[in-house]
Amino acid sequence: MNKRGLLKRLENESVICAEGFLFEAERRGYLASGEFVPELALENPDALKNIHKDFQHAGSDVVEAFTYNGHREKMKVIGKEDLLEPLNRAALKIAKEVAKDVVSGQEPNLVAGNISNTNIWDPSDNNKQKEVRHMFNEMIGWAVDEGVDFIVGETFYYAEEAYTALDEI
């Protein structure tokens, strides 16, 4: 069966995008509370696949790549900036793989990339705004390279940061 895009699906039906991977991974013991960086894609890809599949079996029409907080600023804070691109690409590839794995005759799930708040947004600092824009561009670029169907932006505390994310998407 061919896969319709998000907008085409929304013309005639609801699209469910189940979310909450971070808290589910924490609940299952794969993440420590506090850092909340999606290293699971590198450290235990099978566990991440299983979480995606559980969301899929619960009715999600979208497999959202687990890249929440997987941006340059957060990775720098925990001293793992060198894992930035490998982590993002691994999470995107896992999501894409799971999205294709559907019951015969069913439409494949959509794949969503993900960007989130950066914790460095400063409405009065143009340099910080440029830095945030660069981080969004990086993550969106990797998501596009890996073939996502759309990008989700989430958990922004400043409207201006959310608008910047939307502008980059």
Where do the protein language model's features map onto the residues?
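Domain-level signal for soluble alpha/beta catalytic cores
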Residues: 1-169
